[in-house]
Amino acid sequence: MIRLILHLFLFLFLSSYSCEAYRFSSSDQKVLNSFWKYAEEHRLGNLPVNERIPSIARFFLGTPYQSNTLNVTREELPVINLHELDCVTFVENVLALAFLEQYNQQSTEAFVQNIIRLRYRNAEIVDYTSRLHYSSDWLYEMQQAHLLTDITQFAGGIPYSKQICFMSEHSQKYPQLQKDSSLLKKIKTIETAINQRTYYYIPKDKINEACNKIKNGDIILITTHIKGLDTSHLGFAWKKEGKTYLLHASSKGKQVMI
């Protein structure tokens, strides 16, 4: 079991939005079909959302880890990949499934709608910069849309003062920004907006106290010392025998694990 290293955490709630064209493979459909059966067996539709989240997250235990699964199309599309996950897509997929009103084949489009609502600014896909690349930007936009409640400050958080500029200063790492200078300008504008906001984090010496306020299924964001970057990892809180663990897609473990 991996002990939790907590710096930021929050709880989400979601509603649906209109659907766009999306990429969905036969492998993903197989996973989704298995999930419909799992949802029926576990009566997920009868559970409140906060209890669905940890149950759905457990469904993905053992799913292989794979980074960079969203940048596989020339144009920005809501790519769906359920058979390979990184820490971000794991959280996205679990939440998108948790907020479905029903669990059957007819819910596929609603699932994609939820992905769009979680992944893109104002649930609109214009270009690469529509995607909420920075966790802090995602946090802000979800709150603005009244989809998320950030309890970090309430749990003893202090202001998180850091200049966010990783994408613009490392644009060579992002082919989309290299190909289109206008997108790089948009990213710089987004970074400027992020740096004008106030965010909070939980210092290491306050983690044990904060863990008492965490509930099973809450989302955890982990800050980073990397210059210009806000967070480096995220997952779900998993509570067991009074202790808090992280249920996440692990790059080191190469799978979804606790």
List each model region and its residues.
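Mature, folded catalytic cores of secreted/periplasmic enzymes
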Residues: 34-37, 48-51, 100, 201, ...
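Cationic-aromatic interfacial patches
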Residues: 21-92
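Short, structured beta-strand/loop micro-motifs enriched in basic residues and often containing a Trp
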Residues: 197-204
